[in-house]
Amino acid sequence: MNVFTILIIAVFVVGYLSIALEGVTRINKSAVALLMCVVCWGFYATGGYVEGAEALNESVLRNLGETGTTLFFLMGAMAIVEIVDRYQGFSFVQKVLRAKSKKGLLWKIGFMTFLLSSVLDNLTTSIVMIMIMRKLVAERADRLWYASMIVVAANAGGAFSPIGDVTTIMLWNGGMITGAGVISHVIVPSLMAFLIPMAIVHTRLKGELQPLDGQSVEKGGYGITAFQRDVVFVLGVGGLCSVPVFHSLTGLPPFVGILSVFGLLWFTTEVMYFRKDPQDESPVRVTRLLPRIDLATIFFFLGILMTVAVLAEIGVLADLGSWLQRTIGNSYLVAGIIGAVSSIVDNVPLVACAMKMYPICQAGADFCIDGQFWQLLSYCAGTGGSILIIGSAAGVVVMGLEKISFGWYFRNITPIALAGYLSGILSYWLLHAL
C-alpha cells in the first residue's frame, strides 16, 4: 500500500466522519462530499495508478457516466414529485385518511406512507405525510407516535421498490437487482419491518380524535382546477410506477424512463397554459418549479459516488470485500451489519462501497444479479435507518419538523424498530430456507 493510497483512505475517513457529524460541525455534507471527491481524484491522478492523461480521462469519464445515470434519475424523480406536489396532487390523501379513532388513523397513515414511499422517495413521502398528519392530529403527544411511524413506514416502503429509496435506485441502476426480483423477494421482509412496530404502537394509542373540519380540497391554489390536479397526479405517480416496466420492455437505463415521464408531464402542464399569456409566470409552471429542486442533494451524491469510485479504482474496496468474505463469509451477516451501521451514518456511501466491493457474478451466487446479498442489502440499508432517528434522511427531516428528541425516539421507537428490522431478516431467511 503506497503513500497515495493511504492519503486517499485518510481523506475518505475524515470526510465520512464530517458528513456523519454534520449536525455538530454545521458544515453542509454536500460541500464536504465535493471536496472529498476532488482531493481523492487529485491524489489518484498524481499517484501513478494509470499511465498517461488519456488513461486518466478514460477512468474519470467511465465512472462519471455510471454516476450520471443515478443523478439524472434522481433529478427527474425529484422534479416529477415537485410538480405533483405543487399541483396539489396529494390533497386527496387527506380525505382518504380521515378517521375518528387514533388507532384507525395510525393504520391509515402507516399504510398510505408505506405505499406512497414505494413510488416516491421516502424523504418526500415523509414530508407530505407529516404535513397531512398535522391537519388531522392536534395533540403533540399523539403526533410524536404518528410521526415516528411515518419514518418507519417510509423507510420500509422504499426498501422493496426499485424506485422507493436512493439505495435501491443505486442498486437497480447498477444492475445488482431487477425490479421484479427486489419486489417479489423483499416485500415480505419490508412488511415485517413495518407491521411489527405498527402493531406495538397500536396498543399504546387510545381514545378518539377531535372531529375534523369540512374544508374542501377539491381545488388547489394558483387557479388549479380539480381536473388539472388529477391529470398531473395520474401522469406523475403513474409514470413513476411505469418506469420499471419501461426498463424491462426497452432495456434502456431507468433514467431514460424517468426523463420521458418528466418530459411528458412538463409538456402536459405547458398545454394547460396554451390559451394564457405566453409571459404568464405562474408559480406552478415547471420553469418556476425547477429552481426548487434540491441541488445540494444532487451534489452530495455526485461527491460521494465519485469518491467511492476512486476507492474502487485503487483496489481498496475489492480487498475489503475479500477480507469480509474470509472473516465473516455470511451474506446475511454482512448485509445485516451494513444495515445496522446505516442507522448511525449515511447509507448512500455504505451501499456505494458494497457495490464496488463485490463485482457482479464474480463472487459467488449470492452476489449475482438478484442474488441474496443484493436483495438483503436493499432491505437492510433501507430499513436499518429506522433504528435511530438520525439514521435516514426521512428521520432527520421529521425530527426537525416535529421536534422529536433523539432520546424520546431512542427510548420509545428504537426497540420496536429493531424488532421489526430483525424480523424482516428472519423472514427473508425463512422464505429462502423453505
Language-model-derived ranges and their functions:
Residues 65-75, 181-197, 250-263, 374-384:
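Alpha-helical transmembrane segments
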Residues 1-4, 24-30, 54-68, 179-188, ...:
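Interfacial loop-to-helix junctions that mark the boundaries of transmembrane helices
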Residues 40-50, 64-65, 116-123, 127-153, ...:
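Membrane-interfacial helix-loop connectors
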Residues 194-279:
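Long, contiguous bundles of hydrophobic transmembrane helices that form the permeation core
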Residues 41, 70, 74, 78, ...:
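Transmembrane alpha-helical segments of multi-pass membrane transport proteins and ion-pumping complexes
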